[in-house]
């Protein structure tokens, strides 16, 4: 009785299986000859008697069994026995019935190459490890990063973090990854450092680590609008973003004191007579006019603000002098930033955004040191002394900055209604300065009092007196 046996050469996949028709009353030795005849090129230099045949019933949906196949528990088909001894009934369909093992010394180059590839792949899989990665700050949910620790790269890790978390800091050129694990703190400077660190984690059987991203800040003046939009995720799907990518800032207005308005008008008229402003004016000339506006705004809050030209600040993404910083005297915090431009407002908005983040991140560090829960907002002005843009910057619960940008307010110094336009700008500045004081209001003081009591520290008499005052 003739039967059909599906045969597979050891090391091949199910796709390479081939059928053999033979009478089951024949010997296994006959089956070896038929297999050699069926695969003449594969077994060109092999005698049929040197083939080993194994009974291995593997169904076509269990290809994975071939990768970890052990022949120790399988039946070797002996040449002197009849095929019916091993296959008394019709063999099951859609299964491998016989595994063909050529002699080691005479295996074909194709089979040897395949074996090497399989061994290499298996070794590669054995070195691939799934790490649990958390990106700081304030991200409690991590993600899996599966990587071959002998081929891991810093760029690969950064790209995976960028894909999973999209942290703005990674858009900064030269971002540095600081990694913390129970084994210690690490700052891999190259791929080899990273691989050695991962191998240590594996040997310690601790596959979870936290990544802190540090960015070398660059000068504020080096930032372009497109790079700032990319840094803060403002470009959306636009390759050439415009200022419309910023959410609108509805800047409020507070009526200034008559004294401050009259003083500003007198000072502007004096400057117009002695230092005229025009489209050709340099930034230094425009700064004289801008200072007059800022001074008039601060005069509405005697002794509460200090205007500091060329104050130097630094933050996670930028450093350098500000054209004008407005500090709150009580706390010495920078609450306002002014960027004066000759005419390039787009670049001015970009620079101001990085300046605002730098100012706010510094305030946040101080707030963390004092265990304050809130640290307010910071405001910005971008202007050429004729057109005024107002900005707001705040941080979300994951310490990511968000920005808003107002529509411009324009002052035409030759117009008859000059005072109306000047007053409108001053109203916005006064409102900004009023808002800038709110983080230090009695409400925040009360929140800090409650927080100290909850932590087990009773408020001191001086604290309560300060609250009453």
Swiss-Prot record:
Q: Where is this motif: HVLVXXP motif?
A: 97-103
The record lists the lineage as: Eukaryota, Fungi, Fungi incertae sedis, Mucoromycota, Glomeromycotina
Query: What is the purpose of this protein?
Result: Effector that participates in the arbuscule development step of the symbiosis. Arbuscular mycorrhizal (AM) symbiosis is one of the most prominent and beneficial plant-microbe interactions that facilitates mineral nutrition and confers tolerance to biotic and abiotic stresses. Is not involved in cell death processes.
Record region (DWL domain): 58-96
- Protein localization: Secreted; Host nucleus
One GO CC term, this protein:
host cell nucleus
**Induction of expression:** Expressed during symbiosis establishment in parallel to host M.truncatula PT4, the gene coding for an arbuscule-specific phosphate transporter.
Please report which protein family the annotation says this sequence is part of. Belongs to the Crinkler effector family.
Relate the assembly described in the record. Answer: Homodimer.
Attached carbohydrates are found at: 68, 126, 181, 248
Q: Name one Pfam family in it.
A: Crinkler
The gene coding this protein: CRN1
Recorded source organism is: Rhizophagus irregularis (strain DAOM 181602 / DAOM 197198 / MUCL 43194) (Arbuscular mycorrhizal fungus)
Keywords associated with the record? Glycoprotein, Host nucleus, Secreted, Signal
- Name of this chain's protein: Crinkler effector protein 1
Record's comment describing the protein's domains: The CRN proteins have modular architectures that include a signal peptide, a conserved N-terminus, and highly diverse C-terminal domains. The conserved CRN N-terminus harbors a distinct LXLFLAK motif, which is followed by the conserved DWL domain. A highly conserved HVLVXXP motif marks the end of the CRN N-terminal domains and forms a junction where diverse C-terminal domains are fused.
